[in-house]
């Protein structure tokens, strides 16, 4: 296993309309590094100048308009730590999340760890810049960031607005959950 694993690098998605009326919209990970998928990690991915329409469901796991997830994957029911991939330099820029549905969630970021420590996992630089969230149906599910601090986690939100209000910290529009007690 893992012989064919190569990283996915330098992906640029620009000027797209993503209509997510049934499924997840833009998800980075979570299969990065799982050899059943043949991937070795994700580096230098940019999603810019896009519109995400009608995000329908965000009540569980990482169903959101914009999502970055690093988690352990199994191969036919067996888990191999050495096949988990790094996530580095992921940028969402100038994105409009419009007309969120009654169960929708704008953003989900998750780094999760199983029972034992992962060795060598990296997560560096996940950024959200100039994200506009329009919700005419009322706040449903907050954006959510959760960490197990597997190999470091840096997430930045710059000029992220919800119905015109800038999100500057946790509260009405954003939750942060730290599973390990180590991240801040």
Regions found by a protein language model. Name each.
Residues 1-184:
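Extracellular/periplasmic carbohydrate-active domains that bind, remodel
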